[in-house]
From Swiss-Prot:
Source species: Lucilia cuprina
Compartment(s) of residence: Secreted
Entry keywords, A to Z: Amidation, Neuropeptide, Secreted
Organ and tissue specificity: Detected in the thoracic perisympathetic organs in larvae, and the dorsal ganglionic sheath in adults (at protein level).
GO BP: any one term: neuropeptide signaling pathway
GO CC term, one of those recorded: extracellular region
Name of this protein: FMRFamide-18
UniProt keyword Secreted, yes or no: yes
Phenylalanine amide: modified positions: F12
Outcome recorded upon mutating A6S: In strain: Bangladesh
Amino acid sequence: TPPQPADNFIRF
């Protein structure tokens, strides 16, 4: 699955 915007925020 492609990285979603919400996932990006969690990655940070």
